[in-house]
Each structure stands twice: as structure tokens, then as C-alpha cells.
Amino acid sequence: MTYAPVSDVLSGKLAVDSEVTVRGWIRSRRDSKAGISFLAIYDGSCFDPIQAVVPNNLNNYDNEVLKLTTGCSVEVTGKIVESPAQGQDFELAATDVKVVGWVEDAETYPMAKTRHSIEYLREVAHLRPRTNVIGAVARVRNCLSQAIHRFYHEQGYFWVSAPLITASDAEGAGEMFRVSTLDMENLPRTDAGKVDYNEDFFGKETFLTVSGQLNAEAYACALSKVYTFGPTFRAENSNTSRHLAEFWMVEPEVAFAELDDVAKLAEDMLKYVFKAVLEERRDDLEFFAQRIDKQAITRLEQFVSSDFAQVDYTDAIQILLDSGREFEFPVEWGIDMSSEHERFLAEEHFKAPVIVKNYPKDIKAFYMRMNDDGKTVAAMDVLAPGIGEIIGGSQREERLDVLDARMREMGIDPEHMSWYRDLRRYGTVPHAGFGLGFERLVSYVTGMGNVRDVIPFPRTPRSANF
């Protein structure tokens, strides 16, 4: 018995007249007056289901085949034949249909309807991958993930597993989830009345990580070129289409590198993964272009063929001021540019992806390298047409005295970062890196307007179901 994924049958990998068994779920069943049933069967391997033509002379035709409903799982054996119908080249002439699992009540099955709102699907996140849209998102997400790993492997980078539990705040923002095994009903206290974290599991305050960057720096200062790719957590009370409490980050870190080096790396990586998804998941992208965002494919094709523009933050602010545009958020030097500012630069002024560099130090993190002007740091953001910021990065401050001064300036005790300071004490080197929010990348590729719909089980304020 040869089991075959639906994708292999539909793509023509298997010869006509060969006998195969496909395993999957019923998308739909249609019965003809001629005593034939047409089953649309999907297994997730590709966007399209395969049509199985089932004759009424099968032993279980009346008592099982005619009772199949959306969601039932089946194994169908038959011969691959050329399809006379429009839409696909091959179908299955069934000789055996085995029902593996029934849907208990077809009337109340949450996925019974052919179309559901995106909002409704969030309420049934455990079932939503069975839909066309979320199934396509999952395949695109996988393709992008594999392409990222492949890109860095080909470039000679080592993947580093950054810890999820940390005592460090990489962003200095303080919006962190605390990790504790203390009894919340009976907290141990110090003489001063504060919670005594010496009694906790790790003997100190610990949190879920907001970034793997600091740990990646340690490994870059030994392996030269590394990257992390894993979940990160922010306790931001933000109910927006761009924010999640749990999301994935891609964070390369490069020793003996400056800001321009990682700016080029960011451009090369984005173009590489976009080319990969255009080649490998064309069927899913065509669905997104048809149903979600008409520009889904065009946007990616234009992106990979564009030369990135580069502009200093100070010049970008002047461009915004000279535009004559009335923005919702006023423009002045020193602001952290909002999405409307970023999109104006990428979509209307440069009409291409743009890298903005050298931001004011007061709106950036403590670890970013101070520029000679004393006002700006060697930071960058990559702005993409259609979404705005998609990558943020910087050259790291490798000079211990400057790093210490910067931490004190921002209210961070250097002694609490002693291990991070050691990287500057023992063989310091210029190094740089960036962070890519993976869900924003998936959202950009698919055209899905909300990051809650491009991660399997979204974690947001007041919501941690499933």
C-alpha cells in the first residue's frame, strides 16, 4: 500500500494509473444522480484538496460514504486518473473508502460552514487550522521559518538556543512576565516588607525573556556569527493588530561588524526568504492574493527586485517636515516615528524598502553604540512598504566605559549586568545585530491584517486560551 500526500498526487509526481491511498479530512461531499459521490479530501500538504470519485458499488457506499460530512477523516484508495473537470489535472478513482473518524454532530461542528469570520476563528483556535486561510498561513509560516534557518546556515551562522528564563531586561523597558514558584497566598517577606525572592526557585527575581540578543552577543564573541530564533515575551497591555504577549524573534549577531554590515545582512535575508516563499508556496500566495490582499504576490516581487534606500534619521525627519503632509502624530526631531511616518517614507517618498539609521539616543536601548555626536546611536530600522518597521537593529556598544555611563544614565545598575560587561572586559570587539519579529514577517507576506491570525495560539491581554 502506497500512502501519498495530496500534494504529490496533484503535482503529477506520481504516474497516472498508479494505485495510491490518500489520508485526510473531508472538505465537502457532492452526490450525483448517476450514483457517484465526489469527495474533496485535504491533508494539509498543499492548498487544494483532491477530488475522489466514489462509485455506488462500494460495500459501504450507502451506510458510510453517503453519511460523510465536512471534517470526517478518511483513507481513500484508488487509481490516479486525469481529471476531466476544470481546476485540477488529476483526481482519484476510488476503489475503497475507509472512514477513520466521524464528526459527532455535523449540525454543531464549528467548522461546518464554508466561510467564517476571522474573529470567529480566533475563538476556535484549536480547529481553525482546518480552514483554507489558516492552513495557508501555517504552510507559509513554515516555509519562512525553514528559509530563515537555511539562509543563516548557508551564510555560515550558528544557531544558538537563547534561554526563555532570564534575570536580565534586554530592552530596559520593564514590561516583563515574572517567573515564580512562590505561594501567592503566603509570600515570604524581607525585614523591609518586600517579597523575598531569595526564597524563590532560582534564588532571585526571574522573568520570561523579552529578547535573546544579550545571550547571542556572548556567543557571537566566541563563534563570530550566530543567530537565535525562538519565542519572546512582552507584558505590554496593548490590544492592537501589531502586538502579541508571546511572539517569535529572529536575532542574528555578528562579531567584527558595524551597522552597515548588518543593514546589508537584513536586506539579503529578507530578499532570500521572500524569494523562497514565492517559489515554494505559490498556491497559498495565490489564495491570499485572491481573498485577503490583492497585492500579496506583487508586493513581494517588487520587494525582492528593489534596491533598499538608506537615510539618516535626521534627514528622514526633515523629509517628513518638508512633505506638507498633516500627520496624526506631530513630527519633530527626537520622536520615535509612528507607523504613519514610516509608511510615508517607504511607500510615498522612497517607494522602496528603506533603512533609517542613527536614531536619537533617548529613544533607543542602553546597549546601542554611541555616535561621535553624543546625541545619536548607531541604530537602524528597516521600513517596508505596506507595513512600516519590520526589523530593528544596531551596532552594540563595545566600549566598557561608554556602556557603563549609558547604563547609569538610564537608571540601570552596571553591577546587575556584570556578565554582559565581561564581554567588553575580555577581548571586546565591535559587533552588531538586529531583531525581526517573525509574526510581522508572516503578516507582511500573507496580507493578514492582524498578527493574532498568523501564530497558532495567540497570547494577548486577558486571553491565554488553549
From Swiss-Prot:
Major localisation: cytoplasm
CDD domains hit by this protein: AsxRS_core (cd00776), EcAsnRS_like_N (cd04318)
Pfam family, one: tRNA-synt_2
GO cellular component: cytoplasm
Coiled coil location: none
One record GO biological process: asparaginyl-tRNA aminoacylation
Keyword annotations of the record: Aminoacyl-tRNA synthetase, ATP-binding, Cytoplasm, Ligase, Nucleotide-binding, Protein biosynthesis
Matches recorded under Gene3D superfamilies: Bira Bifunctional Protein, Domain 2, Nucleic acid-binding proteins
Annotated localization: Cytoplasm
Top enzyme class: ligase
Keyword RNA-binding listed: no
Keyword Thylakoid applies: no
Enzyme nomenclature, EC number: 6.1.1.22
A GO MF label: asparagine-tRNA ligase activity
Reactions listed under catalytic activity: tRNA(Asn) + L-asparagine + ATP = L-asparaginyl-tRNA(Asn) + AMP + diphosphate + H(+)
NCBIfam families named in the record: asnS, PRK03932.1
Quaternary structure and partners: Homodimer.
Protein's recorded name: Asparagine--tRNA ligase
Organism ancestry: Bacteria, Pseudomonadati, Pseudomonadota, Gammaproteobacteria, Vibrionales
Gene: asnS
